[in-house]
Amino acid sequence: MARRISGGKGGHASEGFRPSREELLAFVRDNPDQAGKRELARAFNLKGADRIWLKDMLRALQDEGLLEKRAKRLVRSGSLPHVVVLDVFSRDPEGLLLARPSEWPDENGAAPLVSIRPARGDRARVPGIGERVLAKVFPTGEAEGPAYTARVMKVFEKRREAVLGIFRVLQDGSFRIEPVERRQAELIVEPDHANGAKAGDLVEVDQISSGRFGLPRAKVLTVLGSLASEKAISMIAIHAHDIPHIFPPEVIAEAEAARPATMAGREDFRDLALITIDPADAKDHDDAVHAAPDTDEANPGGHIVTVAIADVAAYVTEGSALDREALRRGNSVYFPDRVVPMLPERISNDLCSLREGEDRPALAVRMTFAADGRKLRHSFHRVMMRSAAKLAYGQAQAAIDGRPDDKTGPLLDAVLKPLWGAYAALKRGRTAREPLELDLPERKIVLKPDGTVDRVFVPERLDAHKLIEEFMIQANVAAAETLEAKRLPLIYRVHDAPSLAKQESLREFLATLSLPLARGGQLKPSSFNGILSRVKGSDVEILVNEVVLRSQSQAIYAPENIGHFGLNLRRYAHFTSPIRRYADLVVHRALIGALSLGKDGISRDQEARLDEIAALISAAERRAMAAERETVDRLIASHLASRLEEDFSARVSGVTKAGLFVKLPQFGADGFIPVSTLGDDYYIYDESAHALFGERTGKGYQLADEVEVRLVEIAPMAGAMRFAMLSEPKPLPGSKQSFHKSRRGRARAQRPSPRGRSRRR
């Protein structure tokens, strides 16, 4: 029998009754910030054996897909987080604004409808249709109408409904716009609306008319650059994703007016041989490292590691024009042909860059490690430092490998060898910690001077890279530990364990390879590492690495700590890159305030806004990732535009009921093969095996298969390519025909048609 619940959140029903499934789901829906196991037990007054029953019931609801775990809280599956970015798109009959989340996973179905509450107060900024807002959302619990109401926290800049496209001149001299988004129709531009655009220019246009017949007309608003003569391809993604790339005059003025920091309130670390190790083409250097053996007899074989990070907080004060613009950008965005920095060059490449031989302010952490890599203690210091050397990764590695040059030779014994000695200890600690160790190399694009692709290669992963990475991880952990110890709020970098649904999907796939996967609370990064080690060197190594990667959650910023699953750390924050990440700047300010290192620490106001800031910078990070990925796709598609009808070796990189995505390993680019072009069989989508297999033959294609393909269609500005399959399907003994999946509409592809249509990923 279900317990009756009182009107309050606490629940004071009599003993001996347990809540029904519906009551549990209702509580989770109505209390999105309080629905942990402990809160549920308290709300329904469950004790002893009833708490064990509750745990089992919640697990069952998760297994059924009705609940999911998010930041140690239970939420209804497919629900919105409490703070979310929304796009306002319409009004209801009563005049209230309607919105949808700006990002929504396809697997969650249709995006929920959100009704925006009227703003309170005369000064409240009222959003309009077409604008983007940051809002707190509250479930309505209604079966019909909007699923949520929202209170607007911030209104972003109004997005212009402009079209991005290529300016074309036809043979008769008339002008056309070829939209970057292929679903949009071509546009006609009259000569007096061309705004000086030339053939091949990337332009932003405003549609000015659209009749019942003929193409719509437009006027050119902005000429963004020539695709023939300038590095303009990245500008497509910059504008498509509304990435701020031009600093306002007041921001530039503030940066230019900044003066070098003084020694006031700082320790003098200028005699410590800190060095920077970065990519050879790096322009800004925000971290420097030093290591020395620990002379304390109580720590035999130990090491003292110092990591110094550019003191950006000394120049970017909270609430300033620089600070507001940095938060708006969230992070620097890295394209193959350019960087869109978070901070102006005067700050990022000059005053804050830890240049060799020049005095620079820094926030340093000094850490003592035991011989087995355990961190024994650490301390933070606000310092003035002077980099002893600027080295590239390959240069430092060559010196350690016995090939020092004129610069690294004098540093080898006193500076480099102690660094590698400390890294050997930290590596032992990392091995004991057992973080997730995926082996999926990243590719780097090298461009010619004209901005076109020269080559694509996989950079070698050196110990020098791993050394810096591990030193930075330890510094980030120290920052989180210090702020937690001071009981101060902070923005964590959190990474949740895979959801139960993704775990089960992965478990089904691994079962086809006779590989077991631990369940629930026993699932740790080492569980995945054991599987990856078992398939290392086998035919399915790449396949298993890809599927394990897809099962993982996405790391985000959050004011609540749930730990970092991938790194296998209980607490983690970003501290080491304040030049290019706003999260790190917030952590710097928090440390300065917590440790009384200056008057420019975090304010009460910013502490109160950590929820909002975390949501903003998480969204900015996803925006940057999407823009970077799309730019690479466009560059590669442009590079291959002259190679239609050529054959390529490829690997299946994705499987859907609509067809196969294939990656060209030598270029790192993806294209699509529609299921309707695979042959005369009827292909069925096996989700658990990540495969399409023929109903008649039982043969098909699976994720990570090596195949031969032919390039048959290409749209360079959309970054889209369509291929034809040349390889014959192979037997797939692990695949299974699943009638119940097909009835849910997830498994079966469409019946083959005479002609397939390309689809953009």
Where are the language model's segments positioned?
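A short macromolecule-binding patch
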Residues: 107-117, 184-189, 668-685, 733-734
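Charge-lined substrate channels and their catalytic hotspots, especially those that engage the 3′ end
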Residues: 2-306, 313-358, 390, 395-400, ...
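Eukaryote-biased detector of low-complexity, proline/serine/threonine-rich segments
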Residues: 362, 705-708
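Electropositive polyanion-binding surfaces
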Residues: 210, 236, 240-243, 250-679, ...
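Acidic, low-complexity intrinsically disordered tails
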Residues: 1-19, 682-691, 725-761
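A generic structural motif
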Residues: 92, 141, 156, 171, ...
